[in-house]
Amino acid sequence: MLGFGSMFMDISSELVHSLLPIFMVSVLGASMVTVGVIEGIAEATAAITKVFSGAISDYFRKRKPLVVLGYGLGAITKPVFPLATAIGWVFAARFVDRIGKGIRGAPRDALVADLVPREMRGAAYGLRQALDSVGAFIGPLLAVAFMAWLANDIKAVLWVAVVPAFIAVALLVVAVREPEPAARESGSRCGLTLADAKRLSLRYWLVVGLGGVFTLARFSEAFLVLRALDVGLPLGLVPTIMIVMNVVYAAFAYPAGVVADRIHQRALLVVGLGVLIAADVVLTVATSSALVFIGAGLWGLHMAITQGLLSKLVADAAPDELRGTAFGMFNLVSGGALLVASVIAGGLWSAFGPSATFGAGAGFAAVAAVGLLLYRPRPWDGEHDANT
């Protein structure tokens, strides 16, 4: 049920996200730099919040209350978007919404690890990603349908997102049960301290660094939506870009998670980076909506390969009692990298056009792939699993 709650929130969030970049640029008059800054700050806020929510969930050994609080904040922001008359309203709503995401993110990921055996974690994270992506497919699909029904009235369509958001909160409150603390791990409680950080292995910090470089190469999906508008896709059909991306993501997330439990994970990460490079190259040269659709599909495939795998690597590299903290630190670094990446993406778009934005993304991905190929684990890295 945790996955279904996440799915309903993704229906709501992705309906909003598939239209929000257009709303900011076309209705509220925001520049590309402004879009990049808002998206970057929003995601960085989520990441910073994840550090503390993860540590708190480790300290109190309670994940569910934080997960419910986070989803609740996400739900109450949804009516603000259609009410917005200035870009500041959107920024404030995104800020609070991402605080909610930050509060729920690390405890939710840690709760998944608490509920499943170690050997099934890759599949479990892949299943959660797949359900997220089903919701992320339905959200933009609803956006397209209601844009057609409501004559491209973006504000009216944004009201639709309110309903699934509150369904998600209700599901989590009623149907999700977490194991008792003693069932997870006995021992002293832990908070976010320097001593805790020292207990995290070099293997874990290498995963954190890898996640940061990955994120530099993968800026906000808002720029995919704006790329579709840039090549001339009709306004009411622009959300179909997110549909294509999320269909591919949903189709491949669970199989990729299962594969991650069975083969060399570094090789799988390199494959994921190669797919991201291909997506960026296609989006760099795109002159038609067909090419943007291909690029969006490749983008979704890259996410399916890498996102659940990175979560598995974090879970496997961290002690059980510090798992929430470990996910929080990982998300902090990734969120900071996303802020930098989105600001750079917006600046390049404004100065040189969309091709520069996606070309830079391909460059960052290539650097990450080369670094991953050159890395050789050492005995003191804590990397004993043959698959890692």
Residue ranges and their predicted role:
Residues 1-46, 204-241:
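Helix-loop boundary and gating motifs at the non-cytosolic
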Residues 22-27, 138-158, 340-356:
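Transmembrane alpha-helix termini and helix-breaking/packing motifs in multi-pass membrane transporters
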Residues 49-61, 147, 252-264, 349:
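Helix-to-loop junctions at the C-terminal end of transmembrane segments
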Residues 65-79, 162, 267-282, 362:
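Structural signature of the two symmetry-related core transmembrane helices
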Residues 80-93, 284-295:
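Helix-loop junctions at membrane interfaces in 12-TM secondary transporters
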Residues 93-134:
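Cytoplasmic helix-loop-helix junction between adjacent transmembrane helices
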Residues 162-184, 368-376:
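C-terminal membrane-cytosol helix-exit motif in multi-pass small-molecule transporters
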Residues 178-210:
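Juxtamembrane intracellular "pre-TM" segments in multi-pass secondary transporters
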